[in-house]
Curated annotation (Swiss-Prot):
UniProt subunit comment: Part of the 50S ribosomal subunit.
Domain of life: Bacteria
Keywords noted in UniProt: Ribonucleoprotein, Ribosomal protein
A Pfam family matched in the record: Ribosomal_L30
GO CC, alphabetical: cytosolic large ribosomal subunit
Gene giving rise to this polypeptide: rpmD
Cross-referenced PANTHER family: LARGE RIBOSOMAL SUBUNIT PROTEIN UL30M, MITOCHONDRIAL RIBOSOMAL PROTEIN L30
One GO MF term: structural constituent of ribosome
SUPFAM superfamilies per the UniProt record, alphabetical: Ribosomal protein L30p/L7e
Family membership: Belongs to the universal ribosomal protein uL30 family.
Disulfide bridge positions per record: none
Organismal lineage: Bacteria, Pseudomonadati, Aquificota, Aquificia, Aquificales
An example Gene Ontology biological process: translation
Protein name: Large ribosomal subunit protein uL30
Length: 59
């Protein structure tokens, strides 16, 4: 199963651990999108920054 992740809010003023989580998902700027494999590391990072991103499941 794969998921599409999109950064919808900026990182200005966010904590360093949140910025690292967004970067580890491969997102750099607002409106960046990545399609990632669903695994525990990715899901943990998504959970940490769920207020900054938009997530969709992709077949």
């Amino acid at each position: 199963m794969r998921i599409k992740v999109k950064l919808v809010r900026g990182l200005a003023g966010k904590r360093k651990d949140q910025i690292k989580a967004v970067r580890s998902l491969g997102l750099k700027k607002v409106n960046d999108e990545r399609i990632l494999e669903k695994n525990p590391m990715v899901l943990g990072n998504i959970n940490k920054v769920k207020h900054l991103i938009q997530v969709e499941e992709v077949e």
